[in-house]
Amino acid sequence: MASPEDENPFQDDPGQEDEDGSILSPRGLEAFSRKVTTTASHLMGPVVDPSSSGHYQSAMTEVQKHLRRPNLQRSMFSMARTTPSDLVRSKLSTREIQHRALAHVPDDMLANIPEDDNNSYSLFQGFQASFPELTDEGKKHRRRVSRGRKLLDEGPTTPENGTTGLQKLRKERASMSHELEMLGIRKNMASSEIREIDIKIANLHGMRRIILERLAALEQEETLLEHDLMEVEARVEDAQMLADEAESTAQQSSPRDTDDADAEDNDGFMSQSIYEKIPSAASTPSKSRKPRIVRRKSMAVLHEHFEPGTSIRELRAHQDCITAMDFDAPFGTLVSAAMDDSVKVWDLNAGRCIGSLEGHTASVRALQVEDNILATGSRDATVRLWDLSKAHYDPHGSHYNGGDDDDDAMAFENPDDQPVDPPAGSMADCPLFTLSSHMDEVTALHFKGDTLVSGSSDKTIRQWDLVKGRCVQTLDVMWAAAQASVSLGTGDGAWRQTARSQAEDADFVGAVQVFDAALACGTADGMVRLWDLRSGQVHRNLVGHTGPVTALQFDNMHLVTGSHDRSIRIWDLRTGSIFDAFAYDHPVTSMMFDARRIVSAAGEDVVKVYDKVESRQWDCGAGIKAAEEMKNPPAIVERVRIRDGYMVEGRRDGIVGIWTC
């Protein structure tokens, strides 16, 4: 049973109560101090070092001194009849007391830190040296061999710690050996993965090669089927025309029979001689058929899957220098002309010659093929039109050898590397008509739709109507240059006689291109003139080249020109200024561009290619392979054409090379 003293230890006399309950007696304070000291010793004793328990006792003694102050007594024990033990338990838990005791470091403990005059490293530096992998520098160099070494030198070796240091070194050696072994295992695993990837890549290359062969076979079959379809369409067209003629003849015969009956009744209407002069329907010639424009229904995509600069085929086309060539589409129809006065038509898909075009009396200097319609301009001052769809050509078999066909071999392959003569008469039905109004050789031509323009050494440019087959306009270049000089008063449009790179054999009109009513022509004075065919006047003069212009081509924004001054210039058609320019080591003899590349023949055994997307120059042609294999260099490239990354180049020795670009 609790004594009266235990019931209220804060009173000096249990039977009496002080008038002011907030004032504590000395006896009560001593009892409270003992309880707080006992509680603190009980809670904090197990988690601290016994040697430091005196700190808490001295702390409680200091608390007792402060608690004796009257003001502090009033503020702390203002609540009536609340024991100190209940007050402490309601404010601080065991976990909170332990945390405060561990986290708070009093000043007297900090003052007792021993100082080592012989050690110049701080505690933090020692931590960094012991655990270098936790620092920023250690993280950057974690894979180095020295990552496990200490950054601080160990103290002097004594007999007591010598054994411990040796054990640490052995453990470190074992750890490093294990790590080295693991690195070797990982390296072997990485090598195995690389070998597996190489095997997969080789398998993928093999699969790609097989699929490319399948694609080539599909395109070959597609071309043959398309050729058969065009033949059937031509037969349907002919049958329909014959049916229409028969129907019109039948309709005309009925009224003629009636007229003959009436004439028998009226013998005096006309004499017999008059009737004999009336042409009959059978003798009336039918209207001439227009050239049938045949467009391909499919486009080849095989060349798009080859690496740029890959050689597709080489053709021994001619025995002399190639002067002009053009093709309509990738793996389509190629027409080539040379100094040997021959013009040949080639099937690029099979690599065989379809036939030769005969009619010109001199070599062809310019030509263009579009939708099976071919225009050729020759030194004989004539322009001839041809319909290549009328050629007698069977793409299924060989016309040259009578043996069994080998489907896997390249058709019409010549083992002696000599041009093979095509069958006679295969192109006999191709000529359409001849345009002969020029007085000198035709050096440039271009047609679009029903309009054809041709430039000649007679210093004129003529516009032709392909429907009527006649010349509709003649443009005098010298007269236009004189008119421009007079009207401008600056001499910018005048004929320039002192071009620095003027060549004696340069063509007066080097290149032309027409689109609707717009005409661009490049001449021997280095000028590029833009004409308006509706008025026959020069709309703008582009001055920049110092040599004869040999090639030009324009789209809706830019015009690209090549010249004997060894440069290619890109002009902005909106402002008439130079947008870009490239310089080469030799004169530019031929140039063409597609959506991505500008290709040019610049007096070398390779074709100069400029990639407009990547803005880089590179070479493509047989000269690269010959240089790598230390062989004799091939002939100089004279002509080059490109469409959709499919490039054809013609050389001085008559060989035609076909490349992906």
UniProtKB/Swiss-Prot annotation:
Membrane topology: Peripheral membrane protein
GO molecular function terms attached to this record: GTPase binding
Protein origin, superkingdom: Eukaryota
Keywords: Coiled coil, Membrane, Mitochondrion, Mitochondrion outer membrane, Repeat, WD repeat
One Pfam assignment: WD40
Gene3D superfamilies the UniProt entry points to: 6.10.280.220, YVTN repeat-like/Quinoprotein amine dehydrogenase (2.130.10.10)
Repeat (WD) residue spans along the chain: 317-358, 359-396, 437-476, 478-498, 499-541, 544-583, 585-620, 622-660
Region (Disordered): 1-29, 135-170, 244-267, 275-294, 397-416
InterPro entries xrefs: G-protein_beta_WD-40_rep, WD40/YVTN_repeat-like_dom_sf, WD40_repeat_CS, WD40_repeat_dom_sf, WD40_rpt, WD_LIS1/nudF_dynein_reg
PANTHER family: WD REPEAT-CONTAINING PROTEIN POP1 (PTHR44129)
Protein name per its UniProtKB record: Mitochondrial division protein 1
Gene symbol of the encoding locus: MDV1
